[in-house]
């Protein structure tokens, strides 16, 4: 019954009166990032994208990213050159590209891509690790027409493990945020970015969208074990309550998944 309703709804918006039905997938996910400089395309990072199924009837949303992905070598061997060839075939010269993909039986099944920076701000991690800032490159390109003079480009095999913890919140008015200074002082935390502050409202229409993201914390550590310890401490430190005293945070990432 749900399928029939969804099919009729989709058909009503189709000028061609055809509906594309995709296979529903629940596989693990990865995100990939490319930089295009004067027609040359370079893979700069590949990370695991972890999502949480914590709300009924909406798509799962990200709760963490981990770099580098254990799937990187396999991707470089089997798919990277084909992806670069595809980008070149459509004339991409300069810019930032991201790809989101499922990983099924060791193979990437791509479902989304964009020709821009991402809202996940992963460039903060790559900038810390390899010193090249994609945001600054785009600003420079906008002002001068040239992305960079740097001869050494980022290498996707990060020499340190890195993570982006993403906190999701329920709709409501934010009353109080605790733990910020404790998180800033943790070893390896390089930045944290709030999308809402105390007194602001997360609307009901945000449910099931990235508008539920309230905080991102960026961490670079010397070892994977140190990274996990810092991530756990971040989760323990942060508290966000509504004006009525309700805990607004949705279930967070479990570092045992790393």
Where would I find each of the regions flagged by the language model?
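ATP-dependent carboxylate/phosphate-activation module, predominantly the ATP-grasp catalytic core
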Residues: 23-26, 34-92, 96, 103, ...
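A short, glycine/Asx- and small/polar-enriched loop/turn
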Residues: 103-109, 208-211
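Generic secondary-structure signature for well-ordered alpha-helical cores
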Residues: 8-15, 37, 51-52, 88-92, ...
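Generic preference for hydrophobic
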Residues: 21, 43-46, 110, 192, ...
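A short glycine-rich, hydrophobically flanked beta-strand micro-motif that places a catalytic Asp/Glu
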Residues: 22, 93-105, 150, 249-254
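Rossmann-like NAD(P)H-binding beta-loop-alpha module
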Residues: 1-45
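Peripheral (often C-terminal) accessory segments that flank ATP-dependent C-N-forming ligase machineries
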Residues: 139-258
């Amino acid at each position: 019954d749900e399928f029939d309703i969804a099919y009729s709804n989709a058909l009503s918006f189709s000028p061609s009166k055809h509906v594309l039905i995709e296979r529903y997938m629940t596989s693990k996910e990865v995100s990939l990032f490319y930089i295009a400089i004067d027609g040359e395309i370079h893979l700069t990072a590949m990370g695991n994208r972890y999502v949480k199924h914590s709300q009924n009837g909406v798509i799962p949303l990200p709760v963490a990213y981990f770099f580098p992905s254990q799937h990187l070598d396999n991707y470089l061997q089997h798919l990277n050159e084909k992806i670069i060839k595809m980008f070149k075939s459509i004339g991409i010269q300069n810019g930032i590209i991201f790809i989101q993909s499922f990983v099924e039986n060791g193979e990437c099944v791509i479902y989304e891509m964009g020709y821009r920076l991402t809202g996940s701000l992963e460039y903060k991690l790559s900038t810390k690790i390899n010193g090249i800032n994609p945001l600054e490159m785009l600003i420079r390109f906008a002002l001068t027409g040239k992305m960079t003079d740097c001869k050494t480009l980022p290498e996707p095999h990060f020499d340190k493990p890195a993570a982006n913890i993403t906190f999701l919140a329920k709709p409501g008015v934010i009353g109080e945020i605790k733990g910020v200074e404790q998180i800033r002082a943790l070893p390896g935390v390089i930045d944290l970015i709030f999308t809402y502050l105390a007194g602001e409202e997360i609307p009901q229409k945000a449910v099931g969208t990235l508008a539920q993201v309230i905080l991102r914390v960026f961490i670079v550590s010397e070892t994977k074990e140190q990274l996990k310890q810092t991530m756990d401490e971040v989760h323990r430190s942060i508290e966000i309550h509504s004006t009525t005293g309700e805990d607004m945070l949705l279930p967070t990432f479990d570092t045992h998944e790393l």
